[in-house]
C-alpha cells in the first residue's frame, strides 16, 4: 500500500522545460491530468507529448479547472504569471523561488494569496533539512552557510566568461561568494536552493552562499552548515544531474512530485 497515493488530480504546469517535462511524465504515470501553459510560438510546444494539453493563456487554462498550479519556468514566470494565478484563488507551487529575493514581489504574492483565498507554496526542490532550519529560525545568532559544488558541465558558459576552458579545468574555481540575495539575482536558474535556505531561515542577507565549480565533482553537491543556540547541523547532499539539464539536479522533479501529492494527501508530514 502506497500511503502517499492520492486520487487523480488536474495539474497546470507553467512551462515545459527539462524539470517540467520530467514532472509531467511522473504525474501522468500516477494518473494525474496535466495541462501546460505555454505562450503561442514557444519552442517548448514541440516537446509536449500527446496526452498533455496546451493552453496559450491563463483564461484558456482556466477551462481545465486546475486544482493546483506548478511553476517550473523561471523568475520571469513568477513575476508575470503567478500573480494572475493567485488573484484567481488558485494554489501555486513555485519551484523558481529564487525570484522571491525581491521583497516587494514576495509581499505582493503573499498578499494576493491571502486576499483571494489562494496559497503560495514554496518548493524545497533539491535540498533536505529545511525543517531543521525552520525550527531554528527564531534562535539568537542563527548562522546558515551554503555551498554549491558542481562539475564544469553545469557552469560551462560562466567558466568561458572568466577565461577558463570547461574541458581543461584542473582545479576548483570559486564563481561566487556572497549573500543569498546576491546569489539569487546573479544566478536565477541555478541557486533556488540558496533561496530556500534563506526563506526557511535567517533571511536573504544573513544566509551566506559559495558557488564552486569542481572538475572532480561527480554530481551536484549541496553542503549546508547551520549553527544556533539549539545546536549545529551539517549536511551534504550529492545529487545526480538531470539527464536533460546538467545545471539542475535529477531529484528536483521528484521533489515537486512529492510536494504535489503531499498537497492533496489526507496525511501530511511537516
PLM features: what roles do these ranges have?
Residues 6-11:
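Extreme N-terminal starter segment of soluble prokaryotic enzymes
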Residues 74, 85-104:
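ADP-ribose/adenylate-binding Rossmann-like module
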Residues 19:
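Hydrophobic/small residue at the entry helix of a nucleotide-binding pocket
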Residues 14, 22, 120-121, 126-270:
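Active-site-lining helix/loop region of Rossmann-like oxidoreductase modules
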Residues 52-64:
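Short acidic low-complexity segments
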Residues 97-118:
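Rossmann-fold NAD(P)-binding glycine/threonine-rich loop
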Residues 30-48:
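NAD(P)-binding Rossmann-fold cofactor-contacting core
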